From Swiss-Prot:
The gene is thbs1. It comes from Xenopus laevis. The lineage of its organism: Eukaryota, Metazoa, Chordata, Craniata, Vertebrata. Residues 961-1173 form the TSP C-terminal domain. Residues 50-98 are annotated as: Heparin-binding. A motif (Cell attachment site) lies at residues 929-931. This is Thrombospondin-1. Residues 1-18 form the signal peptide. Keywords: Calcium, Cell adhesion, Disulfide bond, EGF-like domain, Endoplasmic reticulum, Extracellular matrix, Glycoprotein, Heparin-binding, Repeat, Sarcoplasmic reticulum, Secreted, Signal, Unfolded protein response. One of its GO terms (biological process) is negative regulation of angiogenesis. Residues 22-224 form the Laminin G-like domain. It comes from the Eukaryota.
């Protein structure tokens, strides 16, 4: 056997390690390493311990100096350890230690975070020579001590502690200690949420219980067996006594597996090598072992042959007995021992005890080989003796003993022959040769037959507590001796039974004798599974209404058609209720007009109830074109009220019937529009909405050509400047490269930044008036006019035009030189015509307008009760906010407060063309919108599908070609105003210089509005503000969205310190001072400045804009509710989103663009849309 063990020692470590190499690293938890101590570079400096050399050179060893300073195991690692313990229902703990002599200390402990004591601790008690496991459950504490665990010797030793469920087994080195039993399973101590309430500490115990000495390789191990660990430690002789699943005495579970690689573990130690002599001896021993095994096999074969021979003899000779290995014939008698005789009777061995006679002598003895005592010849007659005394108690309490009794004789006067003592054998009871043993169950008996022959029953089996029978206070068997389980036979037959009789049916006649019937069903229960049918008849009948028939008053049909007539015995009659849809007494019934009495029974369109009355009843007309809904009909008021018609406008965007591209938004235009929806590519894409392609610069043109519908080019052609926004796609020289990115637009060899006619071929660069505009493109070549203003757009600049506005009146006699006004009306006689007078009724020739609200200071009172940007005396609806001041019938009353906007005599709530006069209300297709405004609601010649404000004739398309320049810091010697370059018919503006704060605000006014555009900084210089304004009412009152690249303090700290943070901001300006230094610094400042600016929202992520990067903003403003939301896209993704913000400071106003100290700002592909409807 020694040879086999040596061979296993050589082979097993290599195969074991090979199996382990593929495991994960959650099977071994090195407590020192998980706490943060190791010898790697960058690990923490040890606290409370000192690094020393241990017996394992591949792992660090630590001398414990102050266990209180050693940090606990991190909570997440402790939780992983708990999960492993609970999964395996136990653990294996390995530790190498050198403990101070006769000291007491904890190897590890789990202590409560709130200082409530220990939940688990492992303590080596050097004086008591024990290893103590202390456990604290919910209501119980237990201390389990493993005796003779001598660890505190001052020398190196190692321990292996195996805990499984409620059993614990300890090995000190290779020596197995006694097993210990826990009151509760270990997983009930290491609970699932223990890591949140307790710490695991190494070497930390209670008061004066900290470990004293050196520790190494303190590890919890999972995923292997105790046998594998002992084998790898060289403890081969112990492998048959470890706790395993196959050892039923220990009761452990099979949760521990057979691998042993884990959390950053070192390779397992292999068995030491062997010399050639050792191997020669090994094989010699194995040869000897083979000879021994062969001999044992021959002996077993011989014994088997003997047993077979005995079995044959017993079979051939009936009645024989086999006793103590000896075969006896029937009726043979033999002696077993000196006191037992046996007889064979028909294969049954019957033994009996020998009965011994009384011995009248004192020297009676039991000879060898005999059972009864004998007297020797020296005894004589009993003359002259006293009577015998009583027998003494038996000399033994069980088995064979003796009793004695005595008598007396006067030997001086009498011969006294005979013995004075008699002896006899005795046996109170047989000695109990049994031993204490617990009971064990026999095998289960076969299952009994089912307890029923049909239906549901049960079968039973039993077992007896006789394998073995419990004796000498041994434990009874645990569990039940009887077991039942259900059994199912074929369903039992069910005989049918009659159910209850039905009520008698109506008599066949009302008089004169008729018949009526009743029925019953064979269903209580119905026959099933070959059961018998019900006995008897299923029907019954009887005579009814035996009385004589009276005269029938209903024969003359006195009631209304369809009304029930009831006659009585005396000849009278009575009519029932009128049929549905009629009203009356039953004799006379009139049709009910449900359409009139239930005015909302059917859909009402433009004040017309689409209901038709019929006799009887009513029916609704089908829903109008572009509406969906039911077409109910019915009879009577109740049905008309309960089943009303609902017609809803069709919405392809909502019902999914649109054909927009997956990267496009479906925009619902209304059910009167044709088409009813528009597809618009999402930010980062461009196209016609049906097809969308990548759009890097977010200017609405794709990076590559798209295959749109035939002859469709808008937004389907490739972007001629794919990396620089140019929504107008201007290309003067038609070279395929847009002007925005073409360095020589006119191909005259002069680069644009030096070309005085950027779009006109002029290599000579002649410039007579020295205004930096070449003569070839100068609209006033002999007059200095660098701005090239041309009010009447006739090609002749204002600087050299004798009639700037083209109204036929020379400039020196024109009271509105820049506004077309043939009538030259001047109501206030101030020399400024009414068409351009900012106070047409107040004499103010200087035309001062301090707050840039287009109202001269002379007549500007800033009293605006509805906060819509129009002072009360100039507001066409002073008490109802209407920033757009729409008044389509020009009656001086705004549409918002006018009940007949087009003045055609039809009220707005019934007018099928609210903004276009059509007193005839002609609606050919019956869809609810009149022919006069079918596809152009405001009659501005722009179809609703293309109209940005389909309910405002004044606004049809996005256009910033005309705008008002508003400086916000107009004072100072070094004033630099913004320089705005307009492109793409007013849909793209570029601000080119580093300037003071200013706004380019358009003249269109809005209430509810959506405003979007592309933002692009085309320079690396500067890092300041740019953005846009909305709700503009004056230079002191507006909302502004402004964006800064980096956080920066404004250079001028007067009058206030202004700290501008990077990121997007939404602010409301309500300045008491107006444009100037106060407003300038307040705008720069991110935060609130009393009396100037209030910040509604600032991007919490403080993301600044990046150079040469396209962004797309989308503003939603609904003044009625105060809703404001700004979303900023970077490419396809949302970069910042303000979410819903509510502020009702201003009820609408104008839109514009904002800059503050930032040059080369591109505002491209600008779009605004009214959302008042």
């Amino acid at each position: 056997m020694k040879g086999i063990f040596l061979l296993l020692m050589l082979v097993m470590p290599q195969t074991h390690q090979a199996a382990e190499s593929g495991n994960d690293d959650n099977s071994v938890f090195d407590l020192f390493e998980l706490t943060g101590y190791n010898r790697k570079a960058g690990s923490r400096k040890p606290q409370g311990l000192h690094l020393v050399k241990g017996p394992d050179p591949s792992s660090p060893a630590y001398r414990i100096e102050d266990a209180d300073l050693i940090p606990p195991l991190p909570e997440d690692k402790f939780q992983d350890l708990l999960d492993a313990i609970r999964a395996d229902r136990g653990f294996i703990l390995l530790a190498t230690l050198r403990q101070a002599k006769k000291s007491r200390g904890a190897l590890l402990s789990v202590e409560r975070k709130d200082g409530g004591g220990h939940i688990f601790s492992l303590i080596s008690n050097g004086r008591a020579r024990t290893l103590d496991l202390s456990l604290s459950g919910e209501r119980k504490q237990q201390v389990v001590s493993v005796e003779d665990a001598v660890l505190a010797t001052g020398n190196w030793t190692n321990i292996t502690l195996f805990v499984q469920e409620d059993r614990a087994q300890l090995y000190v080195g290779c020596n197995k200690m006694e097993n210990a039993e826990l009151d509760v399973p270990i997983q009930k101590i290491f609970t699932e949420n223990l890591a949140s309430t307790a710490h695991l500490r190494v070497a930390k115990g209670g008061v004066k219980d900290n470990f004293q000495g050196v520790l190494q390789n303190v590890r919890f191990v999972f995923g292997t067996t105790l046998e594998a660990i002992l084998r790898n430690k060289g403890c081969l002789s112990m492998t048959n006594s470890v706790i395993t699943l196959d050892n039923p005495v220990n009761g452990s579970s099979p949760a521990i597996r057979t691998n042993y690689i884990g959390h950053k573990t070192k390779d397992l130690q292999a068995v030491c090598g062997f010399s050639c002599d050792d191997l020669s001896k090994l094989f010699a021993e194995m040869k000897g072992l083979r000879t021994l095994v062969t001999t044992l096999k021959d002996q077993v074969t011989k014994e088997t042959e003997k047993n077979e021979l005995i079995a044959q003899i017993v079979t051939r000779t009936p009645g024989v007995c086999l006793h103590n290995g000896v075969l006896h014939k029937n009726r043979d008698e033999w002696t077993v021992d000196s006191c037992t005789e046996c007889t064979c009777q028909n294969s049954a061995t019957i033994c009996r005890k020998v009965s011994c006679p009384l011995m009248p002598c004192t020297n009676a003895t039991i000879p060898d080989g005999e059972c009864c005592p004998r007297c020797w010849p020296s005894d004589s007659a009993d003359d002259d003796w006293s009577p015998w005394s009583d027998w003494t108690p038996c000399s033994v309490t069980c088995g064979h003993g003796i009793q004695q009794r005595g008598r007396s004789c006067d030997s001086l006067n009498n011969p006294c022959e005979g013995s004075s003592v008699q002896t006899r054998s005795c046996q109170i009871q047989d000695c109990d040769k049994r031993f204490k043993q617990d009971g064990g169950w026999s095998h289960w008996s076969p299952w009994s037959s089912c307890s029923v022959t049909c239906g549901s029953g049960q079968i039973t089996r039993i077992r007896l507590c006789n394998s073995p029978v419990p004796q000498l206070n041994g434990k009874q068997c645990e569990g039940e001796g009887r077991e039942n389980k259900p059994c199912q036979k074929d369903p039992c037959p069910i005989n049918g039974q009659w159910g209850p009789w039905s009520l008698w049916d109506t008599c066949t006649v009302t008089c004169g004798g008729g018949m009526q019937k009743r029925e019953r069903l064979c269903n209580n229960p119905k026959p099933q599974y070959e059961g018998k049918d019900c006995i008897g008849e299923p029907t019954d009948s009887q005579i009814c209404n035996k009385q004589d028939c009276p005269i029938d008053g209903c024969l003359s049909n006195p009631c209304f058609a369809g009304v029930k007539c009831t006659s009585f015995i005396d000849g009278s009659w009575k009519c029932g209720s009128c049929p549905p849809g009629y009203r009356g007494n039953g004799i006379t019934c009139k049709d009910i007009d449900e359409c009139k009495e239930v005015p909302d029974a059917c859909f009402t369109l433009n004040g017309v109830h689409r209901c038709e009355n019929t006799e009887p009843g009513y029916n609704c007309l089908p829903c109008p074109p572009r509406f969906t809904g039911t077409q109910p009909f019915g009879k009577g008021i109740e049905e008309a009220k309960a089943n009303k018609q609902v017609c809803k406008p069709r919405n392809p965007c909502a019902d999914g019937t649109h054909d927009c591209h997956k990267n496009a938004r479906c925009i619902y235009l209304g059910h009167y529009s044709d088409p009813m929806f528009r597809c618009e590519c999402r930010p980062g894409y461009a196209g016609n909405g049906i097809i969308c392609g990548e759009d890097t610069d977010l200017d609405g043109w794709p990076n590559e050509n798209l295959t749109c519908v035939d002859n469709a080019t808008y937004h389907c052609l490739k972007d001629n400047c794919p990396n620089l926004p140019n929504s107008g796609q201007e290309d003067y020289d038609k070279d395929g490269m847009g002007d925005a990115c073409d360095k020589d637009d006119d191909n005259d060899g002069i680069l644009d930044d030096r070309d005085n006619c950027q779009f006109v071929y002029n290599p000579a660069q002649y410039d007579y008036d020295r205004d930096d505009v070449g003569d070839r493109c100068d609209n006033c070549p002999y007059n200095h006019n660098p701005d090239q203003a041309d009010t009447d757009r006739n090609g002749e600049g204002d600087a050299c035009s004798v009639d700037i506005d083209g109204d036929g009146i020379l400039n020196e006699r024109d009271n509105c030189a820049y506004v077309y006004n043939v009538d030259q009306k001047d109501t206030d006689k101030d020399g400024v015509g009414d068409q351009c007078d900012n106070c047409p009724l107040e004499h103010n020739p200087e035309q001062t307008d301090s707050d840039s609200d287009l109202i001269g200071d002379k007549c500007d009172n800033n009293q605006d009760i509805d906060e819509d940007g129009h002072q009360n005396n100039l507001d066409n609806c002073p008490y109802i906010p209407n920033a757009n001041q729409a008044d389509h019938d020009k009656d001086g009353k705004g549409d918002a407060c006018d009940h007949d906007d087009d003045n055609d005599g039809v009220p707005d709530d019934k007018d099928n063309c609210r903004l276009v006069p059509n007193p005839d209300q002609t609606d050919t297709n019956g869809d609810g919108r009149g022919d006069a405004c079918q596809y152009d609601f405001d009659d501005d010649s722009i179809p609703d599908a293309e109209d940005v404000c389909p309910e405002n004739v004044e606004i049809s398309t996005t256009d910033f070609r005309k705008f008002q320049m508003v400086p916000l810091d107009p004072k100072g010697t070094s004033q630099i105003d913004p320089n705005w370059v307009v492109r793409h018919q007013g849909k793209e503006l570029v601000q080119t210089v580093n300037c003071d704060p200013g706004i380019a605000v358009g003249f269109d006014e809005f209430s509810a509005v959506d405003f979007s555009g592309t933002f692009f900084i085309n320079t690396e210089r500067d890092d300041d503000y740019a953005g846009f304004v909305f709700g503009y009412q004056s230079s002191s009152r507006f909302y502004v969205v402004m964006w800064k690249q980096i956080t920066q303090t404004y250079w001028d700290t007067t009058p206030t310190v202004a700290q501008g943070y990077s990121g997007l901001s939404i602010k409301v300006v309500n300045s008491t001072s107006g444009p100037g230094e106060h407003l300038r610094n307040a705008l720069w400042h991110t935060g609130n400045t009393p009396g100037q600016v209030r910040t509604l929202w600032h991007d919490p992520h403080q993301k600044g804009w990046k150079d040469f990067t396209a962004y797309r903003w989308h503003l939603t403003h609904r003044p009625k509710t105060g809703f404001i939301r700004v979303v900023m896209y970077e490419g396809k993704r949302v970069m910042a989103d303000s979410g819903p913000i509510y502020d009702k400071t201003y009820a609408g106003g104008r839109l514009g663009l904002f800059v503050f100290s930032q040059e080369m700002v591109f505002f491209s592909d600008l779009k605004y849309e009214c959302r008042d409807s």
